A protein has these predicted regions:
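N-terminal topogenic module of multi-pass integral membrane proteins
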Residues: 1-68
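Terminal transmembrane helical module of multi-pass membrane proteins
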Residues: 125-184
Length: 184
């Protein structure tokens, strides 16, 4: 596995191990309808939440360094992706109205960036079926996330996790096909 692909896969592993630890420590988050960020507002889950998300951001930065300079769009996207994740971690929505606004702005920008990058990857891969399928799953989960933002009860966490799973799978699998075999 080439280094950029390995780094992005490690970022996904960090994200999901962190989320798994959060769910084990506080399973109520599955039904709270506050999304992934629910776990950033409790003392007992903040550390695995932060490690998971910041691990994903860190390995995205490592992937940037390992990508060829020719991969301008991917490098730029990851340069935006990593700080948005950091922004989500450092702006807990429960810390006041302005923090909530900042948190929501970072999260919305992240989802938008991920959808745009997914579309670009589909185009680069010439609309191969699995990339299009993962993009549609991501889009459907993004729509579900938007629907579940305001209700008291819903599946915001589950929709966000599905969105991130589809995006992460698309990103990692795409690099397998797009990067030259001799990549550093």
């Amino acid at each position: 596995m080439r280094p950029p692909t390995r780094y992005l896969l490690l970022g996904q592993v960090f994200l999901y191990l962190g989320l798994l630890a959060c769910v084990v420590l506080r399973p109520a988050g599955l039904g709270a309808n506050d999304g992934i960020s629910y776990y950033g507002t409790y003392r007992e889950t903040f550390l695995p939440y932060a490690i998971g998300l910041l691990g994903a951001a860190y390995f995205a930065v490592r992937a940037i360094d390992a990508l060829s300079a020719d991969e301008k769009m991917l490098r730029l996207s990851l340069k935006i992706y990593a700080p948005l994740i950091v922004g989500i971690v450092i702006t807990p929505y429960a810390a006041g109205r302005w923090m909530d606004y900042l948190h929501t702005a970072c999260g919305s920008a992240l989802f938008f960036l991920q959808l745009c990058l997914s579309g670009w990857l589909c185009w680069r891969l010439r609309w191969v079926w699995w990339a299009v399928t993962l993009s549609f799953v991501e889009l459907a989960a993004g729509i579900a996330s938007a629907v579940y933002l305001n209700p008291t009860h819903g599946f915001l966490f589950q929709a966000q996790v599905l969105f991130q799973l589809a995006f992460g799978a698309l990103l990692v699998l795409s690099l397998r096909y797009l990067l030259p075999r001799s990549a550093p």
